[in-house]
UniProtKB/Swiss-Prot annotation:
This is Transcription factor IWS1. Keywords: Nucleus, Transcription, Transcription regulation. It comes from Mycosarcoma maydis. Residues 118-127 have a biased composition (Basic residues). Residues 251-328 form the TFIIS N-terminal domain. Residues 98-108, 128-140 have a biased composition (Basic and acidic residues). Pfam families: Med26. The lineage of its organism: Eukaryota, Fungi, Dikarya, Basidiomycota, Ustilaginomycotina. The gene is IWS1.
Amino acid sequence: MADQETAQSPIEEPSESAAQAAAETLADAEIPATDAAADASEGVVDDIDVIPPSDPEHLTTVVRGQDTAAAVRTAAIFDEDDEDEDDDGDEVGNDLPSFRKRDARDASNADDPDAAVMRKKKKKRHHSPEEASSMRHVTDGEVEQEEEDPYANMTEAEIRRARTDRMIDEALRAGKKKAPRKRAGEDDLDLLADEEVAALRREMVTAADDDEEANRLKKPATNKLKLLPKVVATLQKNHLQQSILDNNLLEGVKRWLEPLPDKSLPALNIQHQFFQILERMTIDTISLKMSGLGKVVVFYSMCSRVEPKIKRSAEHLIEVWSRPVLKRSSSYRDRHIASAEWNREALSQRAGPLVVGSVADNNRRNVGIPQAVTAGFRVAPQSVAGQRSDSGHEARMANHKRLNQFKSRLKEAKR
C-alpha cells in the first residue's frame, strides 16, 4: 500500500526544516571531479521532473532514486533561471533563501556540466556607453523601449575592435572642429584689429591738422609728439600689418612726415622712428599709391636739410619700392652684376704713360705727396672658381625664374 500511495501521489512537499537540512548537507559535502561523478550528475538531471513553484516558500520536486540534496541543488539552479526570465514585477528572487544562489555558483565552480549549461543562459548583453546612460535615465511612470544592441552578434574580439574604431572616429571628428577666433566678448579678432587701426588713423590725421594749425598761429606743435608712443607701438605689432595696409594707416604716416606750413621738418624723433619702422615693413605698390607715402620719401632723399642717416634710409626705401614698378626682382640671386673679361693689352696701354712719367722722375730726390684714389668700381671681376660647366645649373636658374614669375602673378591675382 505504501508503494501504491507513493506511485499515486508523485508530488511531495518537503517542509522548510527539511530544505534547510538538505542545504547544510550539500554545503558540507564534497563532489568528486571524476567521470563517474559527472555521469551520476547527468543521471540525476535526467531522473528529475521539475515543476516551477508558484509559492516561493515551497519547493516541489519529484525524485526517483536520488537523495534530497541533489534534488534541492537542481531545483535551486532552475529557480535561479526562472528568476532571470521572470519580468512581471514579482519579487520572487528576494524571498528565496540566499543559499540557492551560492549553491549554483558552487556547482559551476565544481565543474558540473549541467550547472555550466544553465549559467551560460544568463549571459549579459553588451551595451555601448550611450545606451547604458540612456537606460539609466528613466523617468517615473515611463517605460523606456529597449534599443537594439549593435554588438549583439559579435564576438569579444570584434566588440573590442568596433569600440576602438568608434573611439578613433570620435577623436578625429573632435580634431576637425576648430574653435573660432573669439574673445571674452565674442568679438572677431580681425574686426577688432580693423577698428583699432581705423581709430588710430583718425587720431593721427587729427593730430597732424592740429599741429599745422598751431604752426600757423606760431604756437608749439606738440600733438604728434604726445601720440607718437601709441603710433609706434601699433606699427611694430606684426599681427596688425595686414590691417595697417587695408585701413590705409600709411596715410597718417605721410601726414606726420610732411613739412609744416613754415617749411620746417617734423621732429627728429618722429623721423627716426618712422623710417626705422618703414624699412622693416613689407609694403605693396597699391598701398603706396593709395597713401602717397612715396612722394614724401623721395623728398627726404633729395632734401639737403635731412640728416645723412635718414637720407640713406630714404634712398634704400626708394630702391626697394621701385623694383616692383620697374618689374625687377627683389631677390639678390636675380640681380645682374656687370662683369668684364681680363684684357692685358688694354691694361698695358692704360699704364704706358704712367711708366714713362716714372722714368722721367727718377732724377728727383724729393718724395711726392700721396693722393686719395676713388675706389668706385662699377665692373665686378669675373669669377673663375665658381664656374660650373654642367647644364643643370642653367636649368635650375630657369626653374627659379619661372617660380618667381608665378609668385608675382599670384600676388597680383590676390590683389
